[in-house]
Amino acid sequence: MVHLASIVSDLGFWPTVAGTVATYLFYQIVATVYDVYFGPMSNIPGPKLWAASHIPYILMLWNGEDASTKLALHEKYGPVVRVSPTELSYREAQAWKDIYGHQTRGKKSFPKDSRFYAPAVNGAPSILNADDPTHTRHRRILAHAFSDKALKEQEPLLKKWSDMLVSKLKENVEKSPSTPLDLVSWFNFTTFDIMADLTFAEPLYMLEGSTYSPWVRTIFGSLKLGSRLRAVRILPGMTTFINMIMPNSMRQKQVEHFKYSADRVDKRLANKNLDRPDLWAQVLKRVDVDGMSMSVAEMHSNSAIFMLAGTETTATLLSGLTYHLLQNPATMSKLVNEVRSTFPTRDDINVETLQRLPYLNACLEEGMRMYPPVATGLPRLTPKGGAAICGTWIPEDVAVSVSQWSTYQCEENFHKAKLFIPERWMGEDEQFANDNHAAFQPFSTGPRNCIGRNLAYHEARLLLCEVLWNFDLTLDEKSEDWLNQPVFTVWEKDPLWVRLQVASR
């Protein structure tokens, strides 16, 4: 009798389970159909499959196809595209203001999407991922380290490293004149040594050794993995799941990597009276002034951010710009002539004069438009209650961003958008009179725009000028298709092989 009751009970259990699962699936299908065709974002253009499921978007990010796919989607669907059930991509100038700009008249700011901005290993906020009040405090303290006055004081340090770059390049050219050099690596060596000198008061000695340090190799190795983990975290509940299954060895590597920079900050802080114009010299002057403060843990978090955001991006700008100049000989010749005619000797090169070179600055802008160091969108979340973006109301908790690559390649924003033409930035050619410069924000905009913008410009001008003043460049055939690159938050760059010849005087 008991056995029979058990059988009956079992037969009743499984139909119940099947019915529950079927009901759940039916509900999900109905909810998805409603959301895609009748929900508050059903009027936003985009592929229906992407609006119904996160999977296509996650696969796009996983494969490094963010820039190319979003460009294709925008060209098909227009200025705003629904790229997942809970994410929108924009390419309009107004979207920069609505999403990232200063919010007035009681409007709420758009918080950063925590799935994209991972917390530091020590849990302390940095200027990149802090909430608004903490970000304001950090920025007020750090702003002095990136001011024009501070950058002027840092010029000898920048010149020291630009001199070493030229010296090392000449050394290689003299050793093997016909061998092409990978300028991606050389620009990385230089920008990392500069930022380490500014952040830790000691370089990484990559230029001196002409090779990547193990620490920097770890940084580059983590970019792809980090981008893919961010993609997976888009799925609800995956952040907790990833934390559960992450091997202890990987956690230990994260800790060791963070400790490397933290130890060097501690070493610099132990020498508070060190007389040099680095970042922490400026910060230490501001801490506890006017009630402002920054904990040592926060300094550790910020130093880790500086060592990526202030290095790889500048090297990317220089690499991409060099490639485009080499693919456009007339433009290269015009820029080289401006540089060499302005500075009769190398000693004449200085950051103040470089700021005033019109064609050099136009080339930098065009380089960032054609090859933005951060090609993806930087996602924010619509605030509680929702918000209007480009005149359309978007519900709360939707990830929104401006896709830089799509925006800069859009003919509605820039005439002949897919061509490298620095003259568009000089205001002299009528065919570019309607270019929408407000759509161009390579350093973002608003209260959380890139604090290192001035340093990046000074550094890029100086390093490019030094290379062009000292060398004649020719693109090696191995790098003809160099631009064909995946994106994992930043471009995954192949070597840029360039033949250098010391310029004759």
UniProtKB/Swiss-Prot annotation:
Disulfide bond positions: none
Pathway given in the UniProt record: Secondary metabolite biosynthesis; terpenoid biosynthesis
Cofactor(s) this protein cannot do without: heme
GO terms assigned for molecular function: heme binding; iron ion binding; monooxygenase activity; oxidoreductase activity, acting on paired donors, with incorporation or reduction of molecular oxygen
Residues at which heme binds: 450
Superkingdom, natural source: Eukaryota
Protein's UniProt keywords contain S-adenosyl-L-methionine: no
Enzyme class: oxidoreductase
GO annotation, biological process: terpenoid biosynthetic process
Compartment annotation: Membrane
Name of the protein in its database record: Cytochrome P450 monooxygenase efuB
